[in-house]
Amino acid sequence: MIKRQKLKYKWMLITTLITFTTILLFCLIIIFFLKDTLRSSEIDEAERSSNDIANLFHSKSLSDISALDLNASLENFQEILIYDDKGRKLIQTSNDNTLAYDNKIDFKHPERIHIQRSHGINYLVITEPIRSKDFSGYSVLVHSLQNYDNLVKSLYIVALAFGLIATIITAGVSYIFSSQITKPIVTMSNKMNQIRRDGFQNKLELTTNYEETDNLIDTFNEMMYQIEESFNQQRQFVEDASHELRTPLQIIQGHLNLIQRWGKKDPAVLEESLNISIEEVNRITKLVEELLLLTKDRVNHNVLECENVDVNSEIQSRVKSLQHLHPDYTFETHLATKPIQLKINRHQFEQLLLIFIDNAMKYDTEHKHIKIVTQLKNKMIMIDITDHGMGIPKADLEFIFDRFYRVDKSRARSQGGNGLGLSIAEKIVQLNGGMIQVESELQKYTTFKISFPVLN
């Protein structure tokens, strides 16, 4: 199992390593170029001295050249050795008696410029042949690289020290900066744990100096609001469903008890109890079907077969059927002169019409006059269904699409409603890209305005 690390320590470690590596590479590159430049300078200085010695032998004979003449051509930390053709050392002199070069020279295969190490010190050695009127031999210039090596070593030490100091500073700054970044995250984590303990009523009420964390806080609060709303709806749904199921089950239980006591001997009691029980079972079945319909999501809607439905024809068909079933009701229709096509599942549209018309009939038992209007307006299909019944109080308008909500609770059961019809209708409208508006005045009228976008 991978051990989890704190974000601020991980951030500090990563930034410190990157900084140290970058500085180290930068210093190494600089040292590389400095070494090359300094080494070229050392070689140039040694070659100048070697050339001066060669010119001295060309201008004077060996017997006229003194050690002082040779030393005048040398720089500090240089030594000159003169050999004859047989490799015998004739002259050895320098301006610095501390030089400790005593390596042998291979005159059979001499390298003009090479580096040799003697007594722990590197030397640049330049071997030049000397050909003059009275002398033939070799000059060997020994140039100490001790200062060069010490300088390069110092550069490495300075680079390492600079890298370490920069790393320590970076680590400190990184720690402070990462602490500032992770502080709101830690606060959010603590708040989330508090919300987990105390419930959804708490929200993250803090702001930071960073847009990303502020957006995260806003998103979290929005998510918590949706979760709380969903949780409350679920709890209300369970409570309401339990309440709605309790009454028919109690009725069925009561009539079964009647059958058990007297129904076996009294056919009238048996018949009445069975009819009422069947009616309540049908009510429960309808309630369960409506609950299942409400739990279906948009994915289920997408797999439904949609077709171009003639809105006016469907309304006329539904009105004709209802007119036969309810001859005491008057259905007034004002339909658009042009055909109106709506892409929707036909069964859903039929169910939508039945819900609104049935709802209008339930709450208009006095005038029994239902008005249906269709029109095309602003690229929208408008369907208005109006009844002249009891109306809806303004305080109830925002709740009428909630599950199990009834405006007239005393009459709802006798009218056979479960309080789910408008919730189902709203869902059908929303799933098909439409919207619903309600206008109502108490004891006068209620109009449901359903609108859908026109097909392209």
Swiss-Prot record:
Topology in membrane: Multi-pass membrane protein
Reaction catalysis annotation: ATP + protein L-histidine = ADP + protein N-phospho-L-histidine
Positions bearing Phosphohistidine: 243
UniProt PTM comment: Autophosphorylated.
Entries under CDD domains matching the protein: HATPase, HisKA
Key words, A-Z: ATP-binding, Cell membrane, Kinase, Membrane, Nucleotide-binding, Phosphoprotein, Transferase, Transmembrane, Transmembrane helix, Two-component regulatory system
Histidine kinase domain sequence ranges: 240-456
Enzyme Commission number: 2.7.13.3
Keyword Phosphoprotein: yes
TM spans (from-to): 13-33, 157-177
First-tier enzyme category under EC: transferase
MF terms (GO), sorted A to Z: ATP binding; phosphorelay sensor kinase activity
Disulfide bonds: none
Domain HAMP: 179-232
Name the record gives this protein: Signal transduction histidine-protein kinase ArlS
Originating species: Staphylococcus epidermidis (strain ATCC 12228 / FDA PCI 1200)
Source organism phylogeny: Bacteria, Bacillati, Bacillota, Bacilli, Bacillales
